[in-house]
Every structure is written in C-alpha cells, then in structure tokens.
C-alpha cells in the first residue's frame, strides 16, 4: 500500500526543522520530499505542520505477560508504547514462567506475534529462573530469537557466574545487559539513603549498591570483550565508573530513565508507593551527573523502564509497595518539556537518545528516517500543552508520579512498517 504523510516537519542537522512529506510503501520509507501528488496514494495522513521523527526505540520495558496479566499484557503494553511514539521495544524476562529455555521463549514470541501493535524484542535471562547460579543455554536462546541476555530486576550476585555468562555472550556476539545491584549492600532499603529516608524513617539504599557492581562487571567485561550494557544508571559514581571504562576502550554502553533525569528524592511527598522505584530517586548531584553523562556521551540512550503494577499494590506504603513506575506514554513528553523547552537539550539530541542511539548500540534496523529504512514513524505535537492524565493511558497501569504535570509533545500518530499503529484521532 502507498501511504503519504503530508505537511510535516523533520529535523535536519543543526536542529533545523524543514517541511517534509513521507512516501511509505511496502513497509519502508520510499521517498522523502517537500510534497507529493496525493492522487498517487491509497492513504493520506496530514501531520498538520507537526514533527515527524523515526519511531522511538525503548530498550527497557516490562510487559508482564505471561504470568502477571493483572498488571499489563503484551497488547496493552504495546499500545502504551505506540501511544508514546515507540515503534520498537525490548521486553524484560521477569515473567512467569521465566523464558529461560528456547521453548519458553518461543511461547512468549507467539504471544507477541498475536497481540503486539509495535515491534517487541524479547530478552532472555542470564541464569535459570533469574535468581539461580545456573547459566541458561545462550546459544539455543539466541536461535529462538533472544534480543540480549539480562536478569533485570535482580543483579547477578556472583562474579564467577557473571564472568562465564559474559564469556559465552561474547562468543555469540550478544549483549549482556545488567541490572546492577549488590544485594549484600541493600539492608532492606526501599528508597535512596539520605536525608529524606531519615526524615521518613525508611531504610535507605546506598549509592554503592549500584556503582560497586558496575565496577565489578566492567572489570569482567574488559576480560571477556563482551558488549556490556548498564540498565537505568542512577548515581554520580556510576557515571564516573562508566566514563572511565569508555575512556579505557571497554565495550560498555548505558541507559538512563526519564524519572531519574527529572526527579530527586527531595521531590517525594511522603510515604507513598507511587514514588517507589528501583533504582530509587537519588540526590541533586546524582541527577546532574546523569544529565552531564548524556551530554558528554557517557550515557548512550534514554530508556523508560516501563514497570506497570496493580493500583492496590502501588497504593501501599514504601515498605510494602512493589518497585516501579510506568513510563511509555509520558517519556517523550517529559523529556521534551523539561529539557528541550528549557534549552538544556536540543530536539536533535533527544531523538538521538530515544531513537537513533538505542538502535545503533544494539544493531537494530530502526531509529532512522532514511530511504529504504522500515517505515516506523512517530508524529508529535510540540505546541499543545496538556496535563498528564493516567486514566487516559493505554496501559492497564496508572502508577506514575507525573499525574497532573503539564507537558507538550503528545503523540498524534505512530506507524509501524508503514501501517498506522496508534492515532490520537482514533481514540
């Protein structure tokens, strides 16, 4: 089918926006120009002068299916991603059953094939059942379609296990993706160790819990040559360790989540589970280090860590609520409003971190508006300001601390392989 997206604007170098129309055909971008004859197309969509970007790429989401479908499903999670402008997402393996064999992984892909409205790439675990010290069969999992290997939700606690996993992943040319958390340093913590945790009388999580395991893993990554990717970096020390590793030529990449760029522990209003996440919100110096890390290339990309939970679960106290907040439907709006509108980031940088770079570092055919590339496209309204309304989410979950925040940059349309996956007009 020949599809036209007309009257849009795309980013050129030096952050210039130019008028553009996109000709989509056979699932790819066939041509980009100022305008085309509408009579030549079977479908025409009007961008009304708004921003056209490559579809965003999120390398860190939790879709909860199978096993926890009262929180989220592949269908609702992928719709949430599409509503946020994401066309490719990578789903974590903390499921039930854990997809730790080729057969179980194939079953998850069957669900994805049936229900997903965006491209969903599934991670496989590093160890059986996530918490064991028994390595999975990485070769078989790769053949079954594993995107990369991770035990996200828990850190691999034993250095020897991590070393062997890295060695195997390197041999298979696969990435090893790490949730970094030394459990021996947790001490039951539920939020950042600092003045706020003391004020609320809650056990804190040391910054060293994260940075110490990153330092260990980087040493092992140097030894094995694996592509080592650090999930949701949150501390100043972690940024320093990653920066030093990159300077030393070690193949390490890293992501940061929007909430860690925007919020700090001082923003937490009280003992409210909607503010509980892992890693926790850190201090002002940590947040600035994350911003600086993006700007100097230490941190490669922005990933949401979309983590849906049931409402009753998150309405509990910090001690009892599960970790995590949703982020797919708010990520671009929050980053655009808080950083581009304020002049801290450029629009080009944001698209780089949310589309181009995540695709590049994992070798995905995504994140680009070029002739012949997959027609994975988002259209954003940069002009209209509106409050975030969790009740309007496509996600089953509403666990966000950003409800009521006024933001710009809502998604108007999302296309996957040239087909309309989500549009505001259709809602």
UniProtKB/Swiss-Prot annotation:
Describe cofactor binding as the record notes it: Binds 2 Zn(2+) ions per subunit.
Active-site residues per Swiss-Prot or TrEMBL entry: 305
Which of this chain's residues are annotated to bind Zn(2+) 1? 60, 62, 152, 305
- Describe the reaction catalysed, as an equation: (S)-dihydroorotate + H2O = N-carbamoyl-L-aspartate + H(+)
Its required cofactor(s), as named, are: Zn(2+)
Which InterPro entries does the record match to this protein?
Amidohydro-rel (IPR006680), DHOase (IPR004722), DHOase/Allantoinase_Hydrolase (IPR050138), Dihydroorotase_CS (IPR002195), Metal-dep_hydrolase_composite (IPR011059), Metal_Hydrolase (IPR032466)
Query: Where does the source fall among the domains of life?
Result: Bacteria
Name one cellular component (GO) term: cytoplasm
What PROSITE patterns does the record point to? DIHYDROOROTASE_1, DIHYDROOROTASE_2
Which biological processes are named by the entry's GO terms?
A: 'de novo' UMP biosynthetic process; purine nucleobase catabolic process
Any single GO molecular-function term of the entry would be:
allantoinase activity
Keyword set, alphabetical order: Hydrolase, Metal-binding, Pyrimidine biosynthesis, Zinc
Transmembrane residues, as ranges?
A: none
List of residues binding substrate: 62-64, 94, 278, 309, 323-324
Chain sites annotated for binding Zn(2+) 2: 152, 179, 232
Identify the pathway: Pyrimidine metabolism; UMP biosynthesis via de novo pathway; (S)-dihydroorotate from bicarbonate: step 3/3
Q: Does the keyword Cell wall biogenesis/degradation apply?
A: no
Its EC number is 3.5.2.3
Instruction: Extract the NCBIfam families matched here.
Output: PRK09357.1-2 (NF006837), pyrC_multi (TIGR00857)
Q: What does this protein do?
A: Catalyzes the reversible cyclization of carbamoyl aspartate to dihydroorotate.
Family label? Belongs to the metallo-dependent hydrolases superfamily. DHOase family. Class I DHOase subfamily.
What is the protein name given in its UniProt record? Dihydroorotase
Query: Which gene is annotated as encoding this protein in its UniProt record?
Result: pyrC
